[in-house]
Amino acid sequence: MEVHKVVAPPHKSTVAKLKTKLKETFFPDDPLRQFRGQPNRTKLIRAAQYIFPILQWCPEYSFSLLKSDVVSGLTIASLAIPQGISYAKLANLPPIVGLYSSFVPPLVYAVLGSSRDLAVGPVSIASLILGSMLRQQVSPVDDPVLFLQLAFSSTFFAGLFQASLGILRLGFIIDFLSKATLIGFMGGAAIIVSLQQLKGLLGITHFTKHMSVVPVLSSVFQHTNEWSWQTIVMGVCFLLFLLSTRHLSMKKPKLFWVSAGAPLLSVIVSTLLVFVFRAERHGISVIGKLPEGLNPPSWNMLQFHGSHLALVAKTGLVTGIVSLTEGIAVGRTFAALKNYHVDGNKEMIAIGLMNVVGSATSCYVTTGAFSRSAVNNNAGAKTAVSNIVMSVTVMVTLLFLMPLFEYTPNVVLGAIIVTAVIGLIDLPAACHIWKIDKFDFLVMLCAFFGVIFLSVQNGLAIAVGLSLFKILMQVTRPKMVIMGNIPGTDIYRDLHHYKEAQRIPGFLVLSIESPVNFANSNYLTERTSRWIEECEEEEAQEKHSSLQFLILEMSAVSGVDTNGVSFFKELKKTTAKKDIELVFVNPLSEVVEKLQRADEQKEFMRPEFLFLTVAEAVASLSLKGPSLSNV
């Protein structure tokens, strides 16, 4: 068999290596490549298009695209208006703030966002988290002005955090919210949100401030004397209507407009019923009078000092992470369906600046919602102009239609919220996770039950902590396997995976399947020593020749640090004492370079013990074995 040499990598300066490492870490998409070799005018145009994606598609915009965007924009507006009012109440904010948040942020996103399908506005989970975290220290009833100030300040910090992640290209931080974590978190939050609506659906006036399931259910059954049969009847009727339209649209996607228009129709019909029958005099709670006009400025309400600074910063951080994760996940989902690319870092900047601007214009945390984006996509949206159309529709509502909402019953808003969040409970995905990875399923359950029985933020923290623990376990306890030869071939595979694979007498072939660093070097030392001892005992029992070669297959070792180098040096000393030669197979360039630097005495990086494949190593060493052992 021909033996190929392992060559040292081309020399690179430290600066060049650092530059390459930083580029691959923070700029894997190489955004500057489009500027190379271009005249200055072209560079300026492309820079403007990169910062403002609207400039990319705006010159080619046509009337046919406008027709599609107008239809989709009006469709999502019919959903955004009742949802905006409902989600604001979920966040313990005045209902009008929900409409403000459906006006300004979509305009900002239309200019800065890169997704064609993302429909921007308030979302249930971020609303729940914002309201619950702020209410722990400030009552929205006793001090509504301060509560509103803290909500806007939290929105500013959320936007600042989101935009900073995009500018610094640190989006990988949100990847710690794994799919299992999100499914459990969203499912638990959906149940908590639904339970919170029991206050409105039953007509209860005195309700607990806690969010977990036990206090909520206790409060519901402790105040049965406050239950209003009129409210219950209206709530059940509209809830059944909304759930029926949702089920119909799921069964027949072409009828998406049925579920999209159902919330607005429910608001209109219920408002007419309350107005005609004066139901507010018979126990039906209504929104009340809402102010007319566009968003008033709120930058003077932002708080950057005082005793509540830590609260708003923490609330902004949590809501920022959750809303950013949801927005990017939704954007990427629909981009994949339509075969176009969404730049994650651009999205972070767009969503972040959208919230920063929103905090100064009486808006609270917004992002791209899955329900509205799905409707936007089904309605035929072609560009972000659909967000502009939705925003203009909300503007008209704010200017001229606000008196119509005075008699809108709160119970219908609760029914709208329950219908919207029930889709967040994804049982098929949970079953899929159970089949694939039991630990991920455990993480999902911890997130789910943590949200339900503790709090939204604690449930999220537990799930993220378990995800980090899983990553640490994978880093500190890397996979390492014994390899054997598949008879009749030159292929070497895991002995425990391929039962036909056979270990070669006199050789111990180990495959390390991770970088070797300070976190796992001690574990690898103990694991390797144990296998050497077991192999020697096995050789003695079967009366084979003694173990002569320890072969390390290193194709998956992408890097080593100082501790990793020490691991190999100590391993060489250990094997030398046992008259065993240490052999390296296919070490990568970074590993070769560092080991050669550390091997000043040329003790273990000798060419005769470096091979490209395990088969070449075994074939070559089998011929030279006895002589090489004494070199």
From Swiss-Prot:
Q: Which residues lie on this side of the membrane: Extracellular?
A: 91-92, 139-144, 193-223, 278-309, 369-384, 432-441
Which ranges does the record list as Cytoplasmic topological domains?
A: 1-69, 114-117, 166-171, 245-256, 331-347, 406-410, 463-631
| Domain of life of the native organism | Eukaryota
Does the keyword Secreted feature in the UniProt annotation?
no
Instruction: Report a single Gene Ontology molecular function.
Output: secondary active sulfate transmembrane transporter activity
GO cellular component entries: membrane
> Looking at the keywords, is Cell wall biogenesis/degradation present?
no
- Please report the record's description of how this protein sits within the membrane: Multi-pass membrane protein
Instruction: Tell me the keywords, alphabetical order.
Output: Membrane, Sulfate transport, Symport, Transmembrane, Transmembrane helix, Transport
Q: Known Pfam families for this protein?
A: STAS, Sulfate_transp
Per UniProt, residues of the STAS domain are 497-621
Q: In which tissues is it expressed?
A: Expressed only in leaves.
Membrane-crossing residues? Answer: 70-90, 93-113, 118-138, 145-165, 172-192, 224-244, 257-277, 310-330, 348-368, 385-405, 411-431, 442-462
**Stated role:** H(+)/sulfate cotransporter that may play a role in the regulation of sulfate assimilation.
Please report which protein family the annotation says this sequence is part of.
Answer: Belongs to the SLC26A/SulP transporter (TC 2.A.53) family.
Q: What is the name attached to this protein's record?
A: Probable sulfate transporter 3.3
